Amino acid sequence: MSNEYVIGIDLGTTYSCLAYIDEEGDPIVEKNFEQEDTTPSVILFNENGEIIVGSPAKDMAIMYPMERVVTAIKRQIGTDYEVDIDGDKYTPITLSAAILRKMINDFNDNHGVEVKRAVITCPAYFGQTERDATKTAGKVAGLEDVTIINEPTAAAISFGFGAGAGEKKRVMVYDLGGGTFDVTVLDIDGSAFTAVATDGERLLGGKDWDQVLIKIIKQKVCEENDIEESELEDDDDVKQSLILDSETIKKRLSSAESTKGTLTVGG
């Protein structure tokens, strides 16, 4: 039964998602162990040598030094970036594999299978090095057959932009994610999708909005409490709190013009 399912994985900068096609031919987003549709792309190395991935890692991040928490590893895929944890070195491939493995294991546990085949999405502008690294991460995570598909193509298929037999169309896909931004023009001929042009900024996404909010929060905290910004910079707990809270604040500001929050400094 290992080949009963072929899964699709959106390996994202800030959140990742897994889906499959059910017996009726409908796409189903798989819930992880925490009963969430998406898994935070966060990795925590605790003091016992455990590698924790997803919401538990994100929730506990504030309790650990920043160097034991890895986020946005997708931005480093295909590079020689390394993380040293207790003398062990982890690459973007092995770190990405940890995220993939968590989602795959949750799927296997939910369905009582051992899935070995998957389609993993990547930005259209990824070169061969990044694509190969993503595929290798899938293999390290336990997959045997990994296919890489461009994110704009996956989005077009998902939203039903396919053309009928003999029909042609051109669409533009705007993809603003947690860590990357790109716009791709696709030519669709029946079931064939061809990227005509793509451009964007690989270091622009939701996390950068978070960083702007962090800067604003720091300024306001310092102004209203007559403290130096260096006091915030030297406090790891404050920095971790700002990283976590900025995302929550950003979400609130998506539907409100203002919001409030708390920040404990030196307490």
List the predicted regions and their residue ranges.
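Oxyanion-binding/catalytic loops of NTP- or PPi-dependent enzymes
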Residues: 1-79, 83-85, 89, 105-267
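Conserved AMP-binding/adenylate-forming core of the ANL superfamily
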Residues: 88-98
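Short, well-ordered amphipathic alpha-helical segments that serve as non-catalytic structural scaffolds
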Residues: 97-107
